[in-house]
Design a protein with these regions (language model features):
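Active-site beta-alpha connecting loops in nucleotide-dependent enzymes
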Residues: 143-145, 161, 165-215
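Acidic, Mg2+-coordinating active-site environments of NTP-dependent enzymes
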Residues: 5-157, 181, 206-215
Length: 215
């Protein structure tokens, strides 16, 4: 980030990926927020207000963060959330100027609504209109390895295999749970979890079992 000197800094969450190197979520928080220290003067900070650590972030370099999240205490938030299974999620998105619009986030999973809110915050910062932001959200393409739905004659495959961590793995299981029919989870290893590797893999397995995944 010191090379890029960003104009806009966005942090979507403080999970447990890279615990092997940073030991605690607080350590991950310190590392992720370092890019804000490298931000250009007068830049914009956009943070997930639903994250327990990010929501407590005080002004940095004299800049107060803009928060997005599901609750209406955030500057950018969503309600009337209606999951549409693997087709995505319908919702109403609210902007800071009391503007709102209905849209469908075309990628499955409630967590994708949060990501769309982050995008809306960036769009507003860059001067996009609500109509342009809505069009951008509804035109989101899927990419290989990230919540990508692949349909065959017999199967529907949810390809969410890139660089998984416990938070993303649980979100993917939630999406699988929305599907109709027999549900099979093929889960790989989660790396860089350090001394917490065993317990976190067990936690994800128990989560899948609780959700009623068939295999």
């Amino acid at each position: 980030s010191s090379v890029a000197s960003p104009d806009i800094c966005v942090i979507t969450n403080i999970g447990v990926a890279h615990l092997e190197f940073f030991k605690t979520r607080e350590g991950i928080f310190r590392e992720k927020t370092q890019m804000i220290q490298d931000m250009k003067n007068g830049g914009t900070i956009i943070l997930n207000g639903d994250d327990d650590l990010l929501s407590q972030t005080a002004p940095i370099k004299g800049v107060s963060p803009i928060f997005f999240g599901m609750g209406d205490e955030n500057s950018f938030y969503a309600d009337h959330i209606n999951p549409l299974g693997l087709k995505g999620t319908a919702c109403t998105i609210y902007l800071p100027d009391d503007t709102s619009f209905e849209c469908v986030v075309p990628l499955p999973g409630i967590h994708m609504v949060s990501n769309a809110l982050a995008g809306a915050a960036v769009g507003c910062t860059l001067g996009l209109t609500p109509e342009e932001i809505k069009a951008g959200i509804e035109g989101l393409p899927s990419i290989a390895g990230r919540n990508n739905i692949i349909k065959t004659d017999r199967l529907i495959i949810l390809d969410d295999c890139y660089n998984a961590n416990p938070v993303s793995m649980k979100a993917s299981i939630d999406v699988l749970d929305m599907a109709i029919g027999r549900k099979v989870a093929v889960l790989g290893d989660m790396g860089e979890l350090g001394e917490h590797t065993g317990e976190l893999h067990k936690e994800v397995g128990e989560y899948a079992a609780k959700k009623g995944i068939d295999l």
